[in-house]
A protein has these predicted regions:
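Arginine/glycine-rich "motif VI" loop of SF2 helicases in the C-terminal RecA-like domain
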Residues: 97-100, 148-161
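Switch/connector loops and helix/strand junctions flanking conserved nucleotide-binding motifs
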Residues: 66, 139-141, 174-178
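Short beta-strand/turn micro-motifs composed of small residues
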Residues: 109, 167-169
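Accessory nucleic acid-recognition modules appended to NTPase machines
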Residues: 1-126
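Active-site ExK catalytic segment of metal-dependent nucleases
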Residues: 127-138
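Domain-level recognition of nuclease-like catalytic cores that cleave nucleotide substrates
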Residues: 170-193
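Short glycine-/polar-rich loops that comprise or flank the Walker A/P-loop
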Residues: 125-127, 160-164
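Active-site-adjacent loop/helix micro-motif of nuclease/hydrolase catalytic cores
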Residues: 136-147
Length: 193
């Protein structure tokens, strides 16, 4: 809520209270416009502080594009915004497919800004780490490195190791496993429950 209030104040409206923002968020959740992704709190070898605030997503990424008044050409010209919109779409798809497997999707971020866009967690304790990237070899490499860094911090004496590490991309015709590290690279169109 603090971030939302800061954004509102930066846009010139200082009259909105915390309770008003909370009531709007509650209403948007009730009509299925937004959904929170809860922070994942694994057992780590280090004592790194984990950020436990929820990440809020539009249930349908087209709501964000409509609210911003942008279309495909605008997104092509603003790849940063396109990346945020694509992440919303990807997390929504992961939630739908995870739900079919009686699973949940979380997110992870620590004080050192090591993050994981999605942690797909099943009831049997199995989980996978997912980094969402539009595509391109450099972004895929960055995503794989981030996933491997997080995976290496997990204390496998206290919990299972990840079942998979996956970079979920917006482009590509087929999924593959990187030979150098076993990280899966999966186009969003290849996802299935």
């Amino acid at each position: 809520v603090g971030t939302i209030l800061a954004d509102i104040k930066n846009n010139g409206d200082e009259r909105m209270s915390d309770s008003t923002v909370y009531s709007y968020i509650k209403a948007l959740k009730e009509i299925f416009v937004i959904e929170d992704s809860i922070a994942w709190n694994p057992n780590l070898r280090s004592k790194t502080a984990i950020r436990t605030s929820d990440t809020r997503y539009f249930i349908d990424s087209s709501i964000a594009t409509a609210a911003l008044g942008i279309g495909p050409k605008d997104l092509i010209n603003d790849m940063e915004t396109f990346g945020f919109i694509f992440e919303t779409l990807a997390v929504r798809d992961l939630r739908i497919y995870s739900d079919a497997l009686d699973g949940k999707v979380y997110h992870y971020r620590d004080k050192n800004n090591l993050e994981c866009d999605a942690v797909v967690h099943l009831r049997n304790g199995s989980y996978g780490l997912v980094e969402v990237k539009i595509g391109g070899s450099e972004l895929i490499r960055e995503g794989a490195e981030s996933l491997k860094a997080l995976s290496s911090k997990i204390d496998s004496t206290k919990m299972k190791t990840p079942s998979f590490l996956m970079v979920l991309t917006g482009i590509g015709d087929f999924a593959y496993k990187r030979p150098e590290d076993g990280v899966l690279v999966v186009p969003i169109g290849c996802l299935r429950p």
